[in-house]
């Protein structure tokens, strides 16, 4: 006979079961295992559980853990959707300690099965006529994932890579991101394989009008409120809103990211970058540090990076880097935000131009933005831009905090390394939630037929980001994972959605 042991991922709890073994002997072995692990710098508590591993021993036969059972079902049911598989796996694995504490209850209610299955998946054709008079046909999608805490909310992505699996992956992530804001918004996502690049304004308008002609049947200010995303900017939102109003005869807040002349919100452009700094500042405060006087490396030179740089310098930090697809800039005196805006927003030029404004700066081709000695790193450029080697350089150079401004800019290996080395790490679903939070504030203004000042929106945004920071910190601490903000963000988002689902019954 032997006991089985397992440490739940991202948890200091060490579960054991005494299958066929006296409990006293089993615990003695468990304590020896604990001593061995603690001698290697690990810290655990011993917890007697019904399950010792992912395969539970029940009545002489093994039963798969609920998390693994659901993961297998997701893959079997959605075989051609690897992005969706990955998203579900990453979230459920980080929630294992929470799910296992309530496994019997969740299994009986099929709660995870309901959580990973969208409430509605809409797929439709989008015919439109190009400038040459040729009819083109694209595919449109809207996945309304979960409305337990409010109307579906999530962007519309226009890119050739878009398919149902990607939209489901994005929609699933959006559920937890929106929940974290504390605002009454559910999760959804949509889009099409249409590529607006290289298309004339007339062609983009033709596509958007055709797309909305079908989509308008499923959305509304209190039902589903789409927004912009990759490929969907102010131009596209305008065309979509115009067609909705034309068909429905309603002037309502059915889309966010609108222009200021027809219901948009002030501070929306700045929201993600400003929100990133509000959360970073609060995370440092919780850990007894101050952002004032710190040096910061920021990647990217788009909206998020520009306004993160602006707010960081307002808070007394010094941002010394910026980057684009061709290279990066190091300015030891601090990035000139006005110059950066002129280069990127006005001239739409490359960062090679920056040296004309700041002769003492350095321009470097290719990668390398994370090689600079800084206190704080804020990746704001693109997915998987910060690799394991970059993380090692940051740690070696004394970086003590990383917060994600882009969506998943840090690889899994880099994230794990940073956490192991004690670097404060704020995941994107929390750190870059300022954009969706301000979209929800736009919905509120539209509902009230009011337009708030920039200062009012900014103050509300700051409160939301500070609350997100405390919610993820508190959730991590409740489950014995103090300082693990990745787990904390997932737990905080999960608990709110699950509690709402349970309260509303089997629907």
Residues covered by each model-derived region:
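Cationic, amphipathic, low-complexity segments that mediate targeting or membrane/lipid association
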Residues: 2-5, 11, 21-30, 34-37
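Short, positively charged and aromatic/hydrophobic N-terminal segments
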Residues: 13, 17, 31-34, 38-54, ...
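N-terminal ligand-binding/catalytic initiation module
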Residues: 63-266, 496-506
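Adenosine-phosphate binding glycine-rich loop
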Residues: 65-87, 283, 395-507
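Predominant activation on well-ordered alpha-helical scaffold segments within soluble catalytic domains
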Residues: 68-72, 89, 164, 168-172, ...
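General beta-strand structural signal in soluble alpha/beta enzymes
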Residues: 223-227, 250-255, 298, 321-324, ...
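Glycine-rich phosphate/diphosphate-binding loop of Rossmann-like nucleotide-binding domains
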Residues: 267-371
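Rossmann-like adenosine-cofactor binding region
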Residues: 327-425, 430
């Amino acid at each position: 006979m032997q006991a089985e042991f397992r440490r739940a991922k991202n948890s200091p709890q060490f579960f054991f079961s005494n299958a066929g073994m006296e409990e006293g002997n089993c615990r003695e072995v468990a304590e020896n295992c604990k001593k061995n692990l603690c001698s290697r710098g690990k810290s655990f508590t011993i917890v007697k559980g019904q399950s010792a591993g992912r395969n539970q021993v029940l009545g002489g036969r093994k039963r798969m853990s609920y998390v693994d059972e659901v993961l297998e079902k997701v893959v079997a049911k959605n075989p051609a959707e690897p992005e969706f598989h990955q998203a579900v796996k990453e979230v459920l694995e980080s929630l294992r300690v929470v799910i296992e504490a309530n496994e019997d209850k969740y299994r009986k209610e099929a709660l995870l099965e309901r959580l990973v299955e969208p409430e509605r998946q809409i797929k439709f054709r989008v015919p439109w006529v190009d400038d040459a008079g040729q009819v083109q046909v694209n595919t449109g999608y809207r996945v309304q994932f979960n409305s337990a805490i409010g109307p579906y909310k999530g962007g519309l992505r226009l890119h050739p890579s878009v398919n149902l699996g990607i939209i489901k992956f994005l929609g699933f992530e959006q559920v937890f991101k929106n929940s974290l804001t504390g605002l009454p918004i559910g999760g959804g996502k949509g889009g099409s394989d249409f590529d607006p690049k290289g298309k004339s304004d007339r062609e983009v308008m033709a596509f958007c009008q055709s797309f909305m002609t079908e989509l308008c049947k499923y959305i509304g200010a209190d039902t589903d409120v789409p927004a912009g995303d990759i490929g969907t900017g102010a131009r596209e939102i305008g065309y979509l809103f115009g067609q909705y109003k034309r068909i429905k005869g309603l002037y309502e807040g059915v889309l966010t990211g609108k222009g200021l002349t027809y219901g948009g919100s002030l501070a929306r452009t700045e929201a993600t970058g400003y929100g990133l700094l509000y959360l970073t500042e609060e995370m440092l405060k919780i850990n007894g540090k101050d952002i004032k006087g710190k040096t910061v490396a920021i990647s990217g030179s788009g909206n998020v990076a520009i306004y993160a740089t602006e707010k960081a310098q307002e808070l007394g930090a010094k941002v010394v880097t910026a980057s684009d697809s061709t290279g990066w800039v190091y300015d030891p005196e601090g990035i000139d935000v006005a110059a950066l805006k002129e280069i990127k927003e006005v001239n739409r030029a490359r960062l090679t131009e920056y040296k004309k404004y700041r002769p003492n700066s350095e321009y470097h081709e290719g990668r390398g933005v994370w090689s600079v000695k800084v206190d704080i790193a804020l990746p704001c450029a693109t997915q998987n831009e910060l690799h394991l080697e970059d993380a090692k350089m940051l740690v070696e150079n004394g970086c003590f905090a990383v917060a994600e401004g882009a969506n998943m800019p840090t690889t899994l290996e880099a994230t794990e390394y940073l956490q192991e080395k004690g670097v404060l790490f704020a995941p994107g679903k929390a750190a870059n939630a300022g954009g969706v939070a301000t979209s929800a504030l736009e919905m509120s203004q539209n509902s009230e037929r009011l337009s708030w000042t920039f200062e009012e929106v900014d103050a509300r945004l700051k409160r939301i980001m500070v609350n997100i920071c405390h919610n993820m910190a508190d959730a991590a601490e409740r489950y014995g994972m103090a300082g693990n903000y990745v787990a904390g963000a997932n737990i905080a988002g999960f608990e709110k959605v699950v509690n709402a689902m349970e309260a509303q019954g089997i629907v």
